[in-house]
């Protein structure tokens, strides 16, 4: 029997200004869906897997074909509904409604666990959408580079006087998200040793210039790190190995990194984490024929790695969970103090979220890198005093290789996003850009996710698990006229541990787009300021007042 999720075809997004659909509002999701499965973008495109273990763009290849065919014929007063990667309906709405509404991996809370999801997945009744995989706005490892860079820079400020020169970071995982870590570390001025069990992933990062070198030898990796740090160079190396083996070995040897974190796909104990002592081939085979054995062995191995991270923490080394739920897995395996070290958001990033600043991104549907160069320049023009952002854009231009359609990640917040969107739309209208731009973001944004072990960890008022906020975010983006809106469960940290929403809006150069952009790109980050103001953060309360937000129960206006 053939596998409906496997096909050897190669998918790439169309380029240029010629439409394959009836309008740019349907051409945009068509191109971004296809871009998610570009072999230069996706981790395992032949299996529809974009990143993050089994984060897929469509449920089956037949569903992919149906989505493509539907988008090509969708009218400007119709909306396509996608249920866990399957196109289930087309309904008449209106021209300012989203052209696509997506719900992925959502389960009633009592059944929101991997066992139940995997049972549904095996029957072909569900699809894991991760965050930007099933919502068609993944842009490769660049999508998390700036957030990781901001994290490392802030860690440097807090622990090392703002200077990471001569310092090094230990981490694990070089998948679609973790692959950003070596480059982010180097951009922040540090060296990086990244442990990866799957050599093909390390090779992918070498090919796209996200990591500088590769080795199979721990001794060689440490020697290079030592030489680079002594010389004040910022370089990175991928070590082929198992983090659950390497981290404890480093503790045993008394090796002391300057920062420790991890971005293995520990959120998925079957498909995301190689058990100690197993080969990758054995692991892949047993995922299909004995998933329970894989999960048991993987969880035990995670406990070993987290114990090593605790050992680093107890030795005074800054150590953070980078949002993959590995501490939770270790806790469930009996490691009672697994949460002794913090997550990266409460440790370093939350003040940005309080001002609605987060992973704003855009992609050039033309496929021409020059369109991104022009938008980079426009960002600098409109935000002339943000030298930190200018520095980021300069580094990104020099260091980041585009994957698939040219794109840019750029952390900006409430008060700036709508200005950039309107400027980009004007550039499309006057012909400065060769084709429309789409603007989206990661689901891990200021007001669009509830994830108690990641983004909403240790909220000031204890509201970590309240998931009304991403639901309201999705509803508001729908009402505001985003081009497509998504609502997912389980991204980043796995089943039962998160709910989150995404939006993408197309700058097609029209005046209608101006109105939609102004609404969406104001309201979307404003929900994040609202959420943090409601939790009692002074930065958010001050920013809400400065931006004139009307928050009756929070500001009394």
Swiss-Prot record:
Keywords, in A-Z order: Cytoplasm, Histidine metabolism, Lyase, NAD
Cofactor: NAD(+)
Subcellular location(s) of the protein: Cytoplasm
Region of interest (Disordered), ranges: 1-20
Disulfide bonds: none
List of catalytic residues: 410
One Pfam entry name: Urocanase_N
Biological function: Catalyzes the conversion of urocanate to 4-imidazolone-5-propionate.
Protein name: Urocanate hydratase
Organism (species): Brucella melitensis biotype 2 (strain ATCC 23457)
């Amino acid at each position: 029997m053939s596998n409906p999720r496997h096909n050897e075809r190669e998918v790439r997004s169309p380029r240029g200004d010629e439409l394959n659909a009836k309008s740019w509002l349907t051409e945009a999701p068509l191109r971004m869906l296809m871009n998610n499965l570009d072999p230069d973008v996706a981790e395992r495109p032949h299996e529809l897997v974009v990143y993050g273990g089994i984060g897929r763009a469509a449920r089956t290849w037949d569903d992919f074909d149906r989505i493509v065919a539907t988008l090509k014929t969708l009218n400007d007063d119709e909306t396509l509904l996608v249920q866990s990667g399957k196109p289930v309906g087309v309904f008449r709405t209106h021209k300012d409604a989203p052209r696509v509404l997506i719900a992925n991996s959502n389960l009633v809370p009592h059944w929101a666990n991997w066992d139940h999801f995997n049972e549904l997945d095996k029957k072909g009744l569900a699809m894991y959408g991760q965050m930007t995989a099933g919502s068609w706005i993944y842009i490769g490892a660049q999508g998390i580079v700036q957030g990781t860079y901001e994290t490392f820079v802030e860690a440097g400020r807090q622990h090392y006087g703002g200077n990471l020169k001569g310092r090094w970071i230990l981490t694990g995982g070089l998948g679609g998200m973790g692959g950003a870590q070596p480059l982010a570390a180097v951009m922040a001025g540090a060296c990086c040793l990244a442990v990866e069990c799957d050599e093909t992933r390390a090779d992918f990062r070498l090919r796209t210039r996200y990591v500088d070198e590769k080795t199979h030898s721990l001794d060689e990796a440490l020697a290079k790190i030592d030489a680079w740090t002594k010389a004040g160079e910022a370089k990175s190396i991928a070590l082929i190995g198992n983090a659950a083996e390497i981290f404890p070995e480093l503790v045993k040897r008394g090796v002391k990194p300057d920062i420790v974190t991890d971005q293995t796909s520990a959120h998925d104990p079957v498909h995301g984490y190689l058990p100690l002592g197993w080969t990758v081939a054995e692991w892949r085979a047993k995922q299909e024929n004995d998933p329970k054995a894989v999960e048991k062995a993987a969880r035990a191995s995670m406990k070993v790695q987290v114990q090593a991270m605790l050992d680093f923490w107890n030795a005074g080394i800054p150590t953070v969970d980078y949002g993959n739920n590995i501490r939770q897995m270790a806790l469930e395996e009996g490691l009672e103090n697994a949460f002794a070290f913090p997550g990266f958001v409460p440790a370093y990033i939350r003040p940005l979220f309080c001002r609605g600043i987060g992973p704003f991104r855009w992609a050039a549907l033309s496929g021409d890198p020059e369109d991104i160069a022009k938008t980079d320049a426009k960002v600098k023009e409109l935000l002339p005093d943000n030298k930190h952002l200018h520095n980021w854009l300069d580094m990104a231009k020099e260091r980041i290789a585009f994957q698939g359609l040219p794109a840019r990640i750029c952390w900006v917040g409430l008060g700036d996003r709508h200005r950039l969107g309107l400027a980009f739309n004007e550039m499309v209208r006057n012909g400065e850009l060769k084709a429309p731009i789409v603007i989206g973001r990661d689901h891990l944004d200021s007001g669009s996710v509830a994830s108690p072990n990641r983004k909403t960890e240790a909220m000031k008022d204890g509201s970590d698990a309240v998931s009304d906020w991403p639901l309201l975010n999705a509803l508001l983006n729908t009402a505001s006229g985003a081009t497509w809106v998504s609502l997912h469960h389980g991204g980043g940290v796995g089943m039962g541990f998160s709910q989150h929403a995404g939006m993408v809006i197309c700058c097609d150069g029209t005046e209608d787009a101006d109105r939609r952009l102004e609404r969406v790109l104001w309201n979307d980050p404003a929900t994040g300021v609202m959420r943090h103001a409601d939790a009692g953060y002074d930065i958010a309360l001050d920013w809400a007042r400065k931006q004139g937000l009307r928050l009756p129960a929070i500001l009394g206006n």
